[in-house]
């Protein structure tokens, strides 16, 4: 693993612990649970460091699972191209794919995150 990501993963662990404390103190306030994929159905920006963490998580996956993620990501990009939308324009992409199967995060496999330990901060809260 790239050691540059270690401080980020430590921070992500702190976020996880804080979220767990919130869930404990205020049941129902934090809706995230294992198998919940509501946040996987939206578009949001992530930092370059988070993207690197996701990349590292993808590298740890078995080949068949990594290829499945790539196929889903490619399908979303292809759908945007079919509609004439630049995938780098996040707002346009989000509007175009909202309500379609392509809106689901490509890392989501059957309602679970394939890169769970390397997911971005927004996916942890």
Language model: regions and residue ranges:
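Hydrophobic scaffolds flanking metal-cofactor catalytic centers in soluble metalloenzymes
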Residues: 1-125
């Amino acid at each position: 693993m790239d050691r540059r990501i270690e401080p980020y993963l430590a921070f992500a662990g702190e976020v996880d612990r804080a979220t767990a404390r919130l869930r404990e103190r205020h049941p129902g306030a934090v809706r995230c649970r294992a198998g919940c994929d509501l946040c996987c159905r939206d578009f949001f920006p992530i930092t370059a460091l988070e993207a690197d963490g996701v990349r590292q998580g993808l590298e740890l996956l078995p080949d068949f699972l990594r290829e499945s993620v790539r196929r889903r990501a490619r399908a979303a990009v292809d759908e945007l191209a079919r509609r004439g939308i630049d995938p780098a324009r996040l707002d346009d992409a989000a509007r175009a794919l909202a309500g379609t199967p392509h809106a689901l995060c490509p890392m989501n496999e059957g309602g679970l995150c394939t890169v769970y330990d390397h997911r971005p901060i927004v996916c942890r809260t």
